[in-house]
């Protein structure tokens, strides 16, 4: 039985029209997204967060380790946390950074109660900077209620380290189980362990995009933005690690101080990736709002 040629032609034209409409909307969305990136000056914001992170990272780690000390087998968790963090978030330089950061955090943990309070304040400085920049990207002009602010800061300082500790416990249990069932794991799910750093990055960024902005963010948008940021983060980690291993000249120029510019560049790249994901998430929300309210132009601050 032959089909009507006119019907086939109509179906073909309909598919072609849908494809053209999809390409047109994708191009408009990309243009709107990059206009927002340029207008919000994301490279400048990433530089600011990298500088604040350099000042606050040791106090923040001291607070994180103090929270993790509530868990049993703290020494094991701390070693696993340091190994995971520096091997996955500071590529190709984890040995030197692990030694120096362990020394810094150990010295910071010996401070008095006043010194500990100052460490908490410095850690809050980083969280406040993240809060300010995220709300700038989401165009939030209103002030957050103090109870919500305390809740958000408590989640970042308390819940996140506990989640990381729990994930490390889970990964250690999986690794122990994998040693006893090596053939089964290698045939079925050996790659799941390799996905663990990516999944942890995805979960942390998803929580950041959902909790920090002083505005309602849909889970779908936050998940898409976090997925993009986590993928870019893995690509940046591999690329930066390859560059340091094969083309980096920092050691020959800076010598023993080579770790400082390397850390600064890596912090800058990491925050740029996180901010790009946040901008993408915010763009999804505003793009959907503009489609709902037809005829409304995208609003840029200023």
From Swiss-Prot:
InterPro entries: UPF0761_bac, Virul_fac_BrkB. GO terms for cellular component: plasma membrane. The chain crosses the membrane at residues 51-71, 111-131, 150-170, 188-208, 222-242, 256-276. It comes from the Bacteria. Keywords: Cell inner membrane, Cell membrane, Membrane, Transmembrane, Transmembrane helix. It holds the Pfam family Virul_fac_BrkB. This is UPF0761 membrane protein Tola_0461. It comes from Tolumonas auensis (strain DSM 9187 / NBRC 110442 / TA 4).
């Amino acid at each position: 039985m032959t089909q009507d040629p006119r019907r086939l032609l109509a179906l073909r034209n309909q598919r072609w029209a849908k494809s053209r409409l999809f390409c047109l909307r994708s191009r408009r969305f990309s243009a709107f997204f990059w206009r927002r990136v340029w207008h919000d000056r994301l490279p400048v914001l990433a530089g600011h967060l990298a500088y604040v992170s350099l000042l606050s990272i040791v106090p923040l780690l001291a607070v994180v380790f103090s929270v993790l000390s509530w868990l049993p087998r703290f020494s094991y968790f701390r070693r696993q946390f340091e190994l995971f963090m520096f091997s996955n978030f500071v590529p190709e330089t984890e040995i030197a950074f692990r030694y120096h950061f362990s020394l810094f955090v150990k010295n910071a943990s010996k401070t008095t109660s006043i010194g500990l309070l100052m460490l908490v304040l410095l850690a809050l400085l980083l969280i406040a900077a993240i809060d300010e920049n995220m709300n700038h990207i989401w165009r939030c002009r209103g002030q957050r209620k103090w109870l919500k602010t305390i809740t958000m800061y408590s989640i970042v300082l308390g819940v996140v380290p506990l989640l990381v500790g729990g994930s490390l416990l889970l990964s250690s249990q999986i690794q122990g189980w994998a040693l006893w069932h090596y053939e089964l794991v290698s045939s079925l799910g050996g790659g799941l362990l390799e996905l663990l750093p990516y999944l942890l990055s995805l979960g942390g960024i998803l929580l950041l995009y959902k909790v920090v902005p002083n505005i309602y963010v849909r889970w779908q948008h936050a998940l898409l933005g976090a997925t993009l940021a986590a993928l870019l983060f893995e690509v940046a980690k591999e690329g930066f690690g390859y560059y340091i291993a094969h083309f980096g000249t920092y050691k020959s120029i800076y010598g023993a101080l080579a770790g400082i510019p390397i850390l600064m560049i890596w912090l800058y790249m990491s925050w740029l990736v996180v901010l790009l994901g946040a901008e993408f998430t915010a763009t999804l929300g505003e793009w959907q709002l503009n489609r709902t309210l037809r005829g409304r132009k995208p609003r840029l601050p200023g």
